[in-house]
Amino acid sequence: MWRLKIAEGGNNPYIYSTNNFVGRQTWEFDPEAGTPEERAQVEEARENFWRDRFLIKPSSDLLWRFQFLSEKKFKQRIPQVKVQDGEEITREIATTALRRSVHLVSALQASDGHWCAENSGPMFFVPPMVFSLYITGHLNAVFSAEHCKEILRYIYCHPNEDGGWGLHIEGHSAMFSTVLNYNWLGKLGEGRDGGKDNACERARRRILDHGSATAISSWGKTWLAILGVYEWDGCNPMPPEFWAFPTFFPIHPARMLCYCRLTYMAMSYLYGKKFVGPITPLILQLREEIYNEPYDQINWSRMRHLCAKEDNYYAHTLTQIILWDAIYMLGEPLLKRWPFNKLREKALKITMDHIHYEDENSQYITIGSVEKPLLMLACWHEDPNGDAFKKHLARIPDYVWLGEDGIKIQSFGSQVWDTSFVLQALIASNLPSETGPTLEKGHNFIKNSQVTQNPSGDFRRMFRHISKGSWTFSDKDHGWQVSDCTAESLKCCLLFSMMPPELVGEKMGPQRMYDAVNVIISLQSKNGGCSAWEPAGAGSWMEWLNPVEFLADLVIEHEYVECTSSSLQALVLFKKLYPEHRRKEIEIFILNAVRFTEEIQQPDGSWYGNWGICFLSGTWFGLKGLAAAGKTYYNCTAVRKGVEFLLQTQRDDGGWGESYLSCPKKIYVPLEGNRSNLVQTALAMMGLILGGQGERDPTPLHRAAKLLINSQTELGDFPQQELSGCFMRNCMLHYSEYRDIFPTWALAEYCKLFPLPSKND
C-alpha cells in the first residue's frame, strides 16, 4: 500500500536540503502497510473514479486524505446541516457548516505544518520523465513495478473518447500529448495493440488519421528527436550560441521569462549536441508505428513548421519562420565548420555552466517538471556517472504524486501557496479555541519555508533576481521566488503577529519581514503591476517569437492582476504595522498598484485571471486588492463594475460556473448545462462581500451560502468538480485543495459579515 512521507530525505547521499526537508512530500510503496479495510477503501476510490472518469476528470486526491484521517483517527462529530427551500439561513446553520469544514481541514494538516495537494493536470508531464529515465537506463531503478502500475492507471484513466489525450485532462485531444503518451506506453511494456480498452491501437489510429507524428508541435519534435523516433533535421534551430551573446543583444535569453529561459537552455544544449538516446529495437518499432510513410523516406526539413491544427493555439508568425529558416539554412551549416565550430563549443560550455548553476540553486529540484528531465539529460550526457546526474535522480520523487487515478508528475508542488490560503481561511473562521494548534504548526511551516539567501555567487551574471526574503510556490529548497507567494505568506506572518503568541507561536522577526517587502517592491513594474518571478521589462514584441504553438505569453515576464493584488494587500497590512519602514516607497507602490488594477479591468467589469479560471478568479483578486487599498462600491468605479459583473453572472441556484475555455478564448464562457462550480462560487461570493454587497442587498450572498452549505459532504469537505487553475493562457492545472480552501474561506467571511438570526430568535 502506498504511504505519503512528509519532510523526509531518506538515506540517499546525493540529496540535501536548506531546511531539513520541511515541505517535502514523497510517496513510497509499502507492501505490508494498511489494514484490509484501508486497502478496500483505496480500491473503492479507484473503481469510483474509473466509473465516472468522463464526468469528473480531476481526481478528488483521496489517497493521502485517507491516510492522514486514519492516522489521526478523525471522525466528523458535528452533524451535517442543510438549508431547505424557503428556509432562512440561521447563525447556527452557517457556523455549524463552517466548523465542520474547519475541523476536517485541520485534520488534513501534515506533520510539518503544510497542506498536501495534487498540482498537476497537463498530460505532457509524465512522458518526458519516462523518456529521460529510459534513455539513461534508470527507468526500472527509479520506477518500480508498483510505480509503473500506477503510471499506467493514470494514462488509462484520462484518454478522451476518440482515443487521444488532451493537453490537459479536460482538454480536447492534442497531437502533442497523444504522441508522447503513445511512445511512453511502449517504454512501460505495452505493445502495439496493447493497453486497457485497446488504448494503444486507438491512440495510434488517431495519430495516423490526423497527419502522423510529423504534425506534432515543436516541443514534441524535440523530445521525439531526443528519443530517436524523429530527426533533428525536422526541428527548428535552438542554437546555444544565444547564451554566448552579450546581454544587450535584443533577444538574449536573459530577457526571457525564467520558465522559457530554462526550458530552452536545456533544449539548446541537447540541440547543439544533436543528442539522441540509444536506438533500441523498441525505438525502431516506434518509428514504424507513428508515421504514414516509411521513416527513411520522410523529408524532415519540410516537417519543421508543420503543426496539427488542434495543437496550434499560437500560430508561428512570418517573422519567426523567416528567422528560423535563415538560421537553419545559413547559420547551422556554418557552425558545423571550422572556425565557427569553436563558437559552438564555447556556447555549449557556457550553456552547461548555466545548467549546473540552476540545478545547484534549486537543490536539483529545478524550476519545474517541464525542465527537470531536460536538465537531467544534459547532466547525464556530460557525465553519466557524475554527481550532478545522481543528484537529479534523488529529486525525482519530489515530482511524483499519487491519486485514485494513478501516478502523475506534478508541476512541482503547491505546498506554500496552498498553505498560505488555508491559514488565512482558518484565521477568518475566528475559531481560535478550535484551530490554535493547527495555526501554530502552519505558522512554523511558513516561517521555515522563507528563502533566506539570494542565489549563490554573482547571481546577476547568471540572469537571476534576488530571492532573499521570498517564498516559493512549493518549498524552500525549490528556491525560486514568486511575488504572490511571497505576499500571501507575508500576510500570514503579519496576521499571526497580531495574535497571541501563546496561541500561534512567536512572530517572525522584523528583518525577515523587511526582506520580504524588499522582494515584493522589486517586482513592481513602471505601470504599477507586479510580475511573478523576475522584473518585467523586455519588449512585448518578443512574444512574436513564441516558439510554443500551444501556449501563449510565455516568452517574457508580464504583470498579473493576481500578483499585483496579493502584493498590494500585503504591503497595505505591512504599512499599518510598520508605518515607518520605506514609507514613501510603499505609499507609491500602493498608488501605482491601484492604478494598474483599475486600468486592466475588462469592459464588463471583470479581471482576466492568469493563474485561475478565469474571470471569476481574476475578479476576486481585483476586488480584494482594491478593497485592501480602501476602495469601495461608493468611491471606486472599478469596484462597482466588478460587483455588477458578479451579479450578472450568478446562476439560478445561487452559484457561479465558468468554463476553462474562458482562458484561451479571453472571453467569459459559462459552464455547459448551467452548472455551478463551488470553488468559483466561493470566490465570487467573497468578491461580493469585498464589494459591500451585504450592506445593499445580501440576497445574492444568502443564495450562494445556501449552495455551499447544501453541497458540503457528510465528512465535512466539498465535492471535487472541474479544474480550477491555468497557466500560459491555454493549459489547465488541478489544484485539488481548492475545493476545501475557498468554500471554507467564503463561509468564514459570510459568518463574519452578518449578524444572522438564531433559530431561537
From Swiss-Prot:
GO terms for biological process: triterpenoid biosynthetic process. InterPro entries: SQ_cyclase_C, SQ_cyclase_N, Squalene_cyclase, Terpenoid_cyclase/PrenylTrfase. One of its GO terms (molecular function) is lupeol synthase activity. The keyword Repeat applies. Belongs to the terpene cyclase/mutase family. Oxidosqualene cyclase that specifically catalyzes the biosynthesis of lupeol. NCBIfam families: squalene_cyclas. This is Lupeol synthase. It comes from Bruguiera gymnorhiza (Burma mangrove). The gene is LUS.
